[in-house]
Amino acid sequence: MIESPFAKYRSILVDGDYSAAGFLQSFAMSMYAGAAFPLDASGLRNLDDAHMVAFQEMAAWFRRHGESDPDFVDACKAIKANRAAYARRIKSHLDDLLASDPDSYEGGRGEHASSVRFYQREHETNIARRWID
């Protein structure tokens, strides 16, 4: 029996933390729940040959099997859980920053304000991505 590409490339889909892995994760999620997780296809341009093969295998497999592949569903649930955990960490860090004294912050008030802006933007992006409510 042929192995599901969602099992074959699971480590990339679930544990990958680089741009090509992120694109493949987004591609899988767009097949899993396209209305909630639309795909910016411009990321195709960043795939090297090995990741392009993974993309093509996943697309062909999904075309034949849809959501009936338990490896596909499992990988997507893991991606969704990872993204939610990341978004919660960002929100927690933002909350900690907002509760802290800017004058006691390492780097001073300016660094504190910069960090708040960064984490606020990242949190807002995570809400827009539907990674967190």
Residue ranges and their predicted role:
Residues 1-33:
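Short terminal alpha-helical segments
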Residues 5-8, 20-23, 51-54, 71, ...:
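Structural recognition of alpha-solenoid helical scaffolds
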Residues 9, 54-58, 82, 86:
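Amphipathic alpha-helices that form helix-helix packing interfaces
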Residues 12-16, 31-35, 59-62, 79, ...:
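Generic structural signal for hydrophobic core residues of well-folded globular domains
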Residues 30, 45, 61-64, 89, ...:
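General N-terminal targeting signals
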Residues 38-76:
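Short, charged early-sequence alpha-helical segments and their helix-coil boundaries
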Residues 69-133:
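Low-complexity intrinsically disordered segments
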